[in-house]
């Protein structure tokens, strides 16, 4: 979801978009780690516009990943990084977007991901990855004239000054390791 390009809202929020995503991960060792599936919210936008067709963009993802093979003393003792079947999924990426045509965009960049259970189970070293990103996006409703329009510095209408308050509540839990005398930990 995003605002129509070249509108005041698009200029004010600098090409921001958001949505829901699904990702499948294969780490090459399904017996030890599993092949997790992530469900996440994403938000991204334009950092810099180099021409009507080329821009530098960012995107972040936040969600949950499922179907891990967690550590187990007997069944999976080699897995020393993931201790639970469900873990948080965080991702950030930076990429160049090139509008190839009215329908297709090519995206090339770098991405970093982190999987962790936040110390709710041991072990919890977490798993970090850094990858290259290559993608092809299909645009459902881009107008033909949008690529021909030159990009201009955003003209944001005056914003009335005001104070707003947010109330945020959250909860958490964790496991805490305690070594006892005579233990091997």
Where is each model-derived feature located?
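Transmembrane beta-strands of outer-membrane beta-barrel pores
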Residues: 3, 22-28, 62-70, 112-116, ...
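Membrane-embedded beta-strand positions of outer-membrane beta-barrel proteins
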Residues: 18-20, 58-62, 94, 108-110, ...
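Residues that define the transmembrane beta-barrel architecture of outer-membrane proteins
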Residues: 1, 14, 33-39, 84-90, ...
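Gram-negative (and chloroplast) outer-membrane scaffold detector with strong preference
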Residues: 6, 13-66, 185
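Short glycine/proline- and aromatic-enriched beta-strand/turn motifs that initiate or cap beta-hairpins
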Residues: 1-4, 131-133, 137-141, 147-184
